[in-house]
């Protein structure tokens, strides 16, 4: 009877120590999971909602009109984004 009690206590102790180790390991791996997931969501929304344009004086596709200035000057199949002066 005494040996059975010692074995039960030993098993309970080992189980408790394993649970404590697993909980601290999981806590270290998931630092602020809600903040991280909302940051990932924000990044994915930024990628889908923003359209990048080609800067002035950079090469562009005359058929696509992807210039920030809105004007791609055709240079024989390859275009250059027009430089538009800013209004002061």
Curated annotation (Swiss-Prot):
Membrane-traversing stretches: none
Subcellular location: Secreted
Signal sequence residues: 1-22
Recorded GO CC terms: extracellular region
Tissue specificity note: Expressed by the venom duct.
Propeptide span(s): 23-52
Family to which the UniProt record says this protein belongs: Belongs to the conotoxin O1 superfamily.
The protein's role, per its UniProt record: May act as a neurotoxin, but produces no obvious effect on ionic currents when tested on the mouse dorsal rooted ganglia (DRG).
Name assigned to this protein: Conotoxin VxVIB
Native organism: Conus vexillum (Flag cone)
